[in-house]
Amino acid sequence: MTALVGVLVPAAGLGVRLGAGAPKALRDLAGEPLLVHAVRGLRACPSVGPVVVAAPAADVEAVRDLLTAYDVVVVAGGAERQDSVRAALAALPAEIDLVLVHDAARCLTPVEVVERVVDALRSGAAAVVPVLPVADTVKQVADERVVRTVDRAELRSVQTPQGFRRALLEQAHGAATTGLTDDAGLVEALGAPVVTVAGADEAFKVTRPLDLLLAEALLAVTAPVAARHGGGRHAS
């Protein structure tokens, strides 16, 4: 029998770029918090087993109530993302060897992206990230002056879930320094290889008000289609 993977969802961030109000993961999207959409999407994935959510310390009980239907563990997150990932990792059952870390703000990530990351882990990769080609021209700038144009053919935008062997993720967080924005960066700092799989446009991160509008528009299209096919949303 193929072992299930565990998923950590750091969801304690304030999300200041979305404006004042609730923590980002608890912001409303089409009548439900981003976090509910994200966890529902994870629960639609055949390979996903235990899910641990790191919530704002003041909202742990409220988040447990929100997610009652989805069989998740909710723990108090920390001031920084790394603190929340560590707290969630500590609550994951000891027998889980393959771990995904997923942003609650990437709440419309398709099932296929999750399964591609899992397949790469099961095929022997120690660390995996879903990526997309960079569409825009990218320039390096210093003091408001262009230094050079970067070859975008060598660049990729990185999404989540990011997948890891548990021992490697624990080692990376044990040696973590500040200034890195994702878990794969911590692994890279150890000198360990990180492989890529195809991401998806739908797995964008809800960071600004315009992203919320885009997510609402996408849900308005995908939810009726899923209903006509007799099931839940394909990407939630």
Describe the role of every protein-language-model region:
Residues 2-3, 92-97, 122-124:
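Glycine-rich phosphate-binding loop signature in dinucleotide/nucleotide-binding domains
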Residues 47-52, 126, 201-203:
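Short active-site oxyanion
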Residues 1-7, 12, 182-184, 201, ...:
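SAM-dependent methyltransferases
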Residues 48, 96, 124-127, 192, ...:
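Short, high-confidence coil segments that cap the C-terminus of an alpha-helix
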Residues 109-197, 233-236:
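Conserved core of the sugar-phosphate nucleotidyltransferase
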Residues 9, 35, 88, 102-103, ...:
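Residue-level signal for inorganic ion chemistry
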Residues 1-60:
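N-terminal glycine-rich phosphate-binding loop and ensuing alpha1 helix
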Residues 67-99:
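Short phosphate-binding loop-to-helix
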